[in-house]
């Protein structure tokens, strides 16, 4: 088939993706091969592809495709997450646009709307991943709320409850007033804010002098919930308050002064207002001293009846109003500018409210004890390893996980309340009824007598089971698939969910499988724009990935992403990198067309230059292939791509093909041509994981392939020789230096390539065996070893050997002298500038060492060039 003159991704990508699907080349079933398994970090079911997904899934696809070519049984499992908070918020907004409130609907009615929304918008992102070339086993596509996953979640909840690890109780939680649900500690993001510190006057009850204590607080709106004041017993300045009672400003509630060394003597005035219902630390003091708790907030962040004042007003409006009212009452001593960290909901970006609430919790210490050692001793490896410390810190400071959410979209908690109080926990209503009858001794109970908990589970409670539940390891422990595919091989994810997801998967993996869920974790960086800003919709600096693919092709975008993605570091993404990727596609395409355009002539033998070229490139390719394998083993994928890129662009295209290219209108010998096709095949294998579409197209074009059998580069073995003639490769670097210098002389002296030159080697020729290559590449008449160079010759050094090119009458001597004198003048001026800088004592004393070293190198380079120019000018003037 005739190959188009230009590479057009649109002609290639859809065609080959469909071919791979039709021949089920992404499919995996347990067999005798070594498994290679990756589970996709499930994106939100209603999400759309963004640059972070592009990076993450490009990396996963590279790893999976490489494993396939290594002969492993590669299984990449896709799926989506039900994303309770995000999805419910979208459904609520959609209903609101139709004039419907969530509170107007029954749970079942709301869930019908949620399922409709999910079916309409769900899975879009997985379809978009196909455009990227993602080679997932789509038959295995899972959803965290599908039947199999739901059964797994409920079974685990019941099991952990029966083990005494899940409990229900009133605790201080992070409350999201917008989503109207509790959050885990990991779902709270702390942001630095510039606010005020309010100094409030608490009058001492019955004090004849009318004295008062002053309390510093950032939250004056919570004084309605104050039930004590606390001082440090070792604080002399507040000792006069011991045993006293004070009056809460505006509220006029009398509260005791208690003593505890928890109070920081240096903060504010050393007096602390204690609000047990709305501060985590105050809650602990309340528990310790048996203080009452007054919850002054409604779930939506407005003040409740219990507050007594400002009822129904928003908490932040109250803060503004209470400042005025306190000041008017003479109860505000002063305010100061103050910077502190405020907790925000990760999902809704509103300030969270610490709140006492009845919730379900999972005890975490048991899990942390199992999950910390394997990471710290590198049984389970993190790339980059710096994230081990982040992981350790969290594990060593673990807190119980609040797993209940006041939402309807999600896995409903399988707890059923009994008519006379108490509850039972069971995976199904039928089991719950049987347990209820047994617990109450009332055989007449029916399902109508039981009331299931309204709350649902934290989304992460389903996704922590992902590597196990995808292979049905919870419902059917020890089945063929879980035994074969688990533990999975690699996890590719962002460090922002190391606690939410990575750590918890490790925990539950040891709990239910007795081993880690994956062998390696590769943490990607954050995708930023070229100015270093995080990509976001609000900044408008995040390109549409699908538009990038349409413009540059999937291979171009994949390559652009990976060129910008050093392992574990943030990615400074620039469209120019995708353009570089597209240009590389064109380079590959044109090199292929060049080779396939040659005519094989069986009547000619390989030239000496071609034999040397083949021997060199075979070693060079094997050397780079070994380097790439080593880089893959260290997850340095960007460097691996760059190594293959340079091998193809520089070594293969710029050097090898130039060395073997037949003269215009002539044929090429069969031996060299066969070797070249073999090299090209190897290069396509090395490039395929990074650039699957163009490599498949060209591989299919190389020879007649069996399309009916689904023959494909994707499942073609990556097998390369390991032999490297190291000395030969090193010598060839010298040869390249010689050729490059001769080419520079032609360029500088404006001598056409068709004009043959002579080369003189002074002393001894260290690369004499490569003379045929040098002669061909530089169009040389001869290479001779001499004791001294010809008058007027242009010379250069490669290593310790001097080479000279006699120019004779090839140049206009006067013009060349004028050119070199102009260059000499420029270089001398440049050198003076450098010397002036280096003679400046202030610069020498203050400049970083690297800058000084750079300036000294500039000096040395300029002096060397000046010396060479003077010598050349003198030689020309003599001639």
Curated annotation (Swiss-Prot):
<dbReference type="Pfam" id="PF08264">
    <property type="entry name" value="Anticodon_1"/>
</dbReference>
<keyword id="KW-0030">Aminoacyl-tRNA synthetase</keyword>
<feature type="coiled-coil region">
    <location>
        <begin position="807"/>
        <end position="878"/>
    </location>
</feature>
<comment type="function">
    <text>Catalyzes the attachment of valine to tRNA(Val). As ValRS can inadvertently accommodate and process structurally similar amino acids such as threonine, to avoid such errors, it has a 'posttransfer' editing activity that hydrolyzes mischarged Thr-tRNA(Val) in a tRNA-dependent manner.</text>
</comment>
<keyword id="KW-0963">Cytoplasm</keyword>
<dbReference type="Pfam" id="PF10458">
    <property type="entry name" value="Val_tRNA-synt_C"/>
</dbReference>
<dbReference type="InterPro" id="IPR037118">
    <property type="entry name" value="Val-tRNA_synth_C_sf"/>
</dbReference>
<dbReference type="InterPro" id="IPR014729">
    <property type="entry name" value="Rossmann-like_a/b/a_fold"/>
</dbReference>
<dbReference type="GO" id="GO:0006438">
    <property type="term" value="P:valyl-tRNA aminoacylation"/>
</dbReference>
<comment type="similarity">
    <text>Belongs to the class-I aminoacyl-tRNA synthetase family. ValS type 1 subfamily.</text>
</comment>
<protein>
    <recommendedName>
        <fullName>Valine--tRNA ligase</fullName>
        <ecNumber>6.1.1.9</ecNumber>
    </recommendedName>
</protein>
<keyword id="KW-0436">Ligase</keyword>
<dbReference type="GO" id="GO:0004832">
    <property type="term" value="F:valine-tRNA ligase activity"/>
</dbReference>
<dbReference type="InterPro" id="IPR002300">
    <property type="entry name" value="aa-tRNA-synth_Ia"/>
</dbReference>
<feature type="short sequence motif" description="'KMSKS' region">
    <location>
        <begin position="534"/>
        <end position="538"/>
    </location>
</feature>
<feature type="binding site">
    <location>
        <position position="537"/>
    </location>
    <ligand>
        <name>ATP</name>
    </ligand>
</feature>
<dbReference type="InterPro" id="IPR001412">
    <property type="entry name" value="aa-tRNA-synth_I_CS"/>
</dbReference>
<dbReference type="InterPro" id="IPR002303">
    <property type="entry name" value="Valyl-tRNA_ligase"/>
</dbReference>
<keyword id="KW-0547">Nucleotide-binding</keyword>
<dbReference type="InterPro" id="IPR019499">
    <property type="entry name" value="Val-tRNA_synth_tRNA-bd"/>
</dbReference>
<dbReference type="GO" id="GO:0005829">
    <property type="term" value="C:cytosol"/>
</dbReference>
<dbReference type="InterPro" id="IPR009080">
    <property type="entry name" value="tRNAsynth_Ia_anticodon-bd"/>
</dbReference>
<keyword id="KW-0648">Protein biosynthesis</keyword>
<dbReference type="Pfam" id="PF00133">
    <property type="entry name" value="tRNA-synt_1"/>
</dbReference>
<dbReference type="InterPro" id="IPR010978">
    <property type="entry name" value="tRNA-bd_arm"/>
</dbReference>
<keyword id="KW-0175">Coiled coil</keyword>
<dbReference type="InterPro" id="IPR033705">
    <property type="entry name" value="Anticodon_Ia_Val"/>
</dbReference>
<dbReference type="InterPro" id="IPR009008">
    <property type="entry name" value="Val/Leu/Ile-tRNA-synth_edit"/>
</dbReference>
<dbReference type="GO" id="GO:0002161">
    <property type="term" value="F:aminoacyl-tRNA deacylase activity"/>
</dbReference>
<dbReference type="InterPro" id="IPR013155">
    <property type="entry name" value="M/V/L/I-tRNA-synth_anticd-bd"/>
</dbReference>
<keyword id="KW-0067">ATP-binding</keyword>
<dbReference type="GO" id="GO:0005524">
    <property type="term" value="F:ATP binding"/>
</dbReference>
<comment type="subunit">
    <text>Monomer.</text>
</comment>
<feature type="short sequence motif" description="'HIGH' region">
    <location>
        <begin position="43"/>
        <end position="53"/>
    </location>
</feature>
